[in-house]
Amino acid sequence: MIKKITKVTLCIILVVSAFSLLMAWRLDVFVKIDEKKPSTCEAIELYGSAEDIEIDYSNGTAYLSILDRKGLIQGKDVQGSIGRIDLNNMPWEIESVFSGEGLDNFRPHGLSIYGNTLAAINHPKERGKDPESIETFAISSKGIEHDKTLISPLLESPNDLVLVAEDKLYIGNDNMFNSNINSFEKIQQQLGRPYSTIVFYDGADMSIAAKNLASVSGLNVTEEGYIIASETNAKRMRVLKQLDDGKLEKLGAISLDGSPDNISISGDKIVVAQVASVSSLIQHFISLQKGDYKPSPSKIESLVFESDKSNYVRKREIMFLSLGEDISTASVGVQWDDKLLIGSITDDKIYVCQLGE
């Protein structure tokens, strides 16, 4: 009897230990941040934080998803905007090109550009209750003009999106609001079990393109047409192939040390922002709720994508890694010539660094 009890106790200890180690890995408890940054960086102040930045490389224009997310965390009723930078004219200045005109509410998140179309995820005031939407815009020399609003029950918790044509796009759902799973499954989801989806819009209707993903927080498309999706809870980027009917076939994955967020792609280079320490990010959000400020580390990594390699990566490089005292909670990194632009979840600025020094 005593031996049986001892075995049961040991099994319980092993299970608890394994669970604790898994949570420690998920939360980056043992991560040590050794800063690596360009020597020359400067901040451009904003009237909110730029969670996502998209560059139109054909004409050198950057679009920013701007919202007072710090105020949002503190329970304030805030409205956002889309900002624009002419990257060809120095010094860079940010102008607002859309502030929700014609919409009852505008709280932008992920952005995407294709040709003369810009698309933005728009969150409602009552997330989880009111419908999420995708707003599309026509781009012209004068600015951007709102075109249409796309709504579907499949948009449960949209985080990012990517246009693959002017009237076709993929939308990634993260794990914040998912009505299709129970409370126990939500706990498993936080541990990395994949319950998230990618939705396809074909110009008329929406459908599920891919299932069982670990919280999609970033989406983009390579020159060859592969969809790259951030699986934040699994610390990896998923490589997917577009099929003729819009569905996505899972091909493989790119492992990362951090939890990936937004992805930018230019040529064969992928630039991905990562949460370097989830535990620090949680502490950052808690401090904001209390009216304090505790920075969270920021990480930007570049990878040279090669579709015929087994791990899809020819080269990796840390472009920016800091404790967050210069820019905290980095959510996006985009490269323009020899400059790196970094946006943040909560910091009211973008950070611009000179590369190659």
What are these regions, as identified by a protein language model?
Residues 27-49, 93-96, 144, 312-323:
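A short helix->beta-strand "capping" segment at the edge of beta-propeller domains
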Residues 47-56, 100-116, 152-168, 192-197, ...:
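Beta-rich, blade/repeat-based domains predominating
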Residues 50, 69-71, 75-115, 119-124, ...:
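Blade-loop segments of beta-propeller domains
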Residues 257-320:
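Loop/turn-rich, solvent-exposed surfaces of beta-rich toroidal or solenoidal domains
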Residues 99-164, 172, 176-177, 183-185:
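Asp-box/WD-like beta-propeller blade repeats and closely related beta-sheet repeat scaffolds
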Residues 42-80, 327-332, 346:
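Beta-strand-rich domains and repeat architectures in extracellular enzymes and scaffolds
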Residues 64-78, 121-129, 171-193, 273-297:
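Short, conserved, GDST-rich strand-edge loop motifs in beta-rich repeat architectures
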Residues 79-88, 131-141, 188-203, 292-308:
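Beta-propeller blade signature
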